[in-house]
Regions:
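Basic, Lys/Arg-enriched alpha-helical interface segments
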Residues: 2-57, 74-77, 93
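Short hydrophobic/aromatic beta-strand or adjacent loop that forms the aromatic wall/cage
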Residues: 57, 66-68
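Conserved strand-loop elements at the edges of beta-sheets that form or border functional pockets
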Residues: 62-64
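Enriched for short, Lys/Arg-rich terminal
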Residues: 68, 72-93
Length: 93
C-alpha cells in the first residue's frame, strides 16, 4: 500500500521542522526523519493507528514525540491528511 502526504500534511511537517530548527537545526532534521519513518510504516500496517476523532480517519500517535498523524485508509493508499501537535485544537472535518 502506498503512503501519500497531502499538501496540508507536508506543510505541517515543514512548519514543525522550521519551528524546531530555529533553536536546534540538527534536532529538527532528526525529528522530521523520525516522523517520516513512522508514517511510512503505515504502508505495511495501515490500521495500526487508533480510530480518529473525525469520522473516517485514523490517528497515528508518534510516540515519544507530541505529534499525531491524521490519515485515511483507501483501497490502495494511505492518505496523510494532517500532522498535528497533540495539544493543538483539532479541525472538525
Amino acid at each position: 500500500m502506498r503512503v501519500r502526504w497531502t499538501a496540508d500534511a507536508a506543510d505541517d511537517l515543514e512548519q514543525i521542522s522550521d519551528y524546531i530548527a530555529e533553536d536546534r537545526p540538527g534536532t529538527a532534521r532528526r525529528i522530521a526523519m523520525d516522523i517520516i519513518r513512522s508514517v511510512d510504516a503505515l504502508d505495511a500496517f495501515p490500521n495500526q493507528g487508533r480510530q480518529g476523532r473525525v469520522e473516517g480517519t485514523r490517528e497515528l500517535v508518534l510516540t515519544p514525540l507530541p505529534f499525531i498523524a491524521v490519515y485515511e485508509v483507501h483501497d490502495d493508499e494511505v492518505q496523510i491528511l494532517r500532522l498535528l501537535h497533540g495539544a493543538q485544537e483539532w479541525p472538525t472535518s
